[in-house]
């Protein structure tokens, strides 16, 4: 086989590839329980992960999408648990409305305090973040300990986020942290089980920012079929 002539690169535009991917996702996913406002987030999570099981496991607080849109349009801060989430997020759409996306886990004072208390930087980063991001979006895709600490701070009345996107991946405390998040009164986006990660957290956050940037409004929660 002559590999020099066998391979022919695609010549379609990126938008065409994405559009075709979304069509395939909708067709393969079939009937689902998600509302019109929730579905774009699920669609982008599946698009990023190629994992329909993960997409079907998504859970939403009834006010999650509207809360996320409101936070972005109001210029609230977005807090990421790790740099990967920060780097992957479309900052232009966040900054357009006066917000910014910040990550605290590598701050020198966070590292020093974590060492002093013999705990994780993820935990200390959440304690710092809540002082600067009242009403903001917390996007956690890597560290279950960060999500568990944020949940504790919410329960104790120390944190009042506008939206929590909690999709950490892993075997230790990942599923459990998401179960606890789903019990809270604050708006959240999460999923059932161990799957998740920074890339799907970015997908969910970017989907929210696209909706916020588009000017879309939701007055109901009509179910898609």
UniProtKB/Swiss-Prot annotation:
Full protein name: Cobalt-precorrin-8 methylmutase
This protein's record includes keyword Cell inner membrane: no
Function: Catalyzes the conversion of cobalt-precorrin-8 to cobyrinate.
UniProt signal peptide: none
Assembly and oligomerization: Homodimer.
One GO biological process term: cobalamin biosynthetic process
Family stated for the protein in its record: Belongs to the CobH/CbiC family.
Enzyme nomenclature, EC number: 5.4.99.60
Organism of origin: Priestia megaterium (Bacillus megaterium)
Reactions mediated catalytically: Co-precorrin-8X = cob(II)yrinate
Encoding gene, per UniProt annotation: cbiC
Key word Manganese present: no
GO molecular function, one term: precorrin-8X methylmutase activity
Pfam family, one: CbiC
Keywords: Cobalamin biosynthesis, Isomerase
Binding, substrate: 21, 44
Coiled-coil residue windows: none
Active site (record annotation): 47
